[in-house]
């Protein structure tokens, strides 16, 4: 998928809206003046005059619309690394125990030699020991914003009759991490999120968030394997999650496993027997099926 970003004047904006009128779509982004989708390409015209085309046919549609592609601010495929990028990723959403760590990191091309020397890669391919060694170095060198949602706070916010579900809470965390990083004066040419939902669904949930920013977003599956900025965020977030998991375990006197398998069921049942439901409210995500499985183990 390609992304084209152009700056167009009022006359061209008016002409564009007329051409794409039959293809108009809604956008929850308050900074977007006009949105359309044609031939699989999403077109976003911002109030600032910035025009963004996202999709595999971005170049072809730009030519069809007679847009000044030669004046493109940047043109990048989803695995381009030659521009300053903010990458955002989360860790912990699939684990019963522990919170959710979300990190947004800013990587400039000048950082690439440092990152490659460290062997930065998708954190899912690295051992926990390696991550714990690399993460502090990244935190010191790379501008980033880390957020950790504790299990206790997660349980207050996520579930039936509560403000968020498992998807919308991640939208809120990613949005806030990126927003806070931008507030530090960071100026990326692209912002990439490791895709955990569709762009339209992301924008739907984003509508209820207080903080917004005008920068367009690129959503890519397994983005941590394509962008160093997302890989950095993945590593820092993994380390933050592991630290939180370890601290929760120390508080309760149990070693808490990562993931949502049978090992989590077993430890959860032990915690229920020792401390009651309050221990899971403190250390785990209660809406996971592991809670009921742990309760069932107690009756055996």
From Swiss-Prot:
Keywords noted in UniProt: Cytoplasm, Endonuclease, Hydrolase, Magnesium, Metal-binding, Nuclease
CDD domains cross-referenced by the UniProt entry: RNase_HII_bacteria_HIII_like, RNAse_HIII_N
UniProt: a divalent metal cation binding residues: 89-90, 194
Enzyme class: hydrolase
Pfam family, one: DUF3378
Cofactor(s) in the UniProt record: Mn(2+); Mg(2+)
Cofactor comment text: Manganese or magnesium. Binds 1 divalent metal ion per monomer in the absence of substrate. May bind a second metal ion after substrate binding.
Gene3D superfamilies in alphabetical order: Ribonuclease H-like superfamily/Ribonuclease H, TATA-Binding Protein
Stated family: Belongs to the RNase HII family. RnhC subfamily.
PANTHER family reported for this sequence: RIBONUCLEASE, RIBONUCLEASE H2 SUBUNIT A
Described function: Endonuclease that specifically degrades the RNA of RNA-DNA hybrids.
Protein name stated in the entry: Ribonuclease HIII
Organism of derivation: Streptococcus pyogenes serotype M2 (strain MGAS10270)
């Amino acid at each position: 998928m390609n992304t084209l970003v152009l700056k167009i004047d009022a006359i061209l904006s008016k002409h564009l809206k007329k051409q794409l009128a039959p293809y108009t779509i809604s956008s929850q982004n308050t900074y977007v003046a006009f949105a359309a989708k044609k031939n699989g390409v999403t077109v976003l015209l911002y109030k600032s005059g910035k025009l963004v085309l996202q999709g595999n046919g971005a170049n072809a549609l730009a030519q069809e619309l007679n847009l000044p592609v030669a004046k493109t601010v940047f043109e990048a495929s989803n695995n381009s690394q030659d521009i300053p990028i903010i990458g955002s990723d989360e860790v912990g959403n699939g684990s019963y125990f522990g919170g959710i760590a979300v990190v947004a990191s800013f990587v400039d091309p000048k950082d690439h030699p440092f990152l490659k020397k460290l062997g930065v890669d998708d954190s899912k391919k690295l051992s926990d020991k390696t991550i714990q060694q690399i993460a502090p170095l990244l935190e010191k060198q790379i501008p980033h914003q880390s957020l950790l949602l504790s299990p206790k706070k997660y349980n207050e916010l996520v579930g039936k009759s509560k403000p968020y579900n498992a998807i919308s809470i991640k939208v809120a965390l990613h949005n806030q991490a990126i927003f806070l990083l931008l507030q530090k004066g960071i100026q990326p040419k692209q912002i990439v999120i490791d895709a955990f939902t569709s762009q339209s669904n992301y924008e739907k949930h984003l509508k209820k968030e207080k903080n917004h920013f005008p920068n367009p977003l690129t959503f890519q599956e397994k983005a941590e394997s394509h962008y160093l900025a997302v890989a950095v965020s993945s590593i820092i977030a993994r380390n933050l999650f592991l630290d939180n998991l370890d601290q929760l375990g120390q508080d309760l006197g149990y070693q808490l496993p990562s993931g949502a398998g049978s090992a989590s069921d077993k430890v959860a049942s032990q915690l229920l027997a020792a401390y009651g439901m309050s221990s899971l409210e403190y250390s785990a995500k209660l809406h996971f099926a592991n809670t009921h499985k742990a309760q069932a183990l107690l009756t055996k």
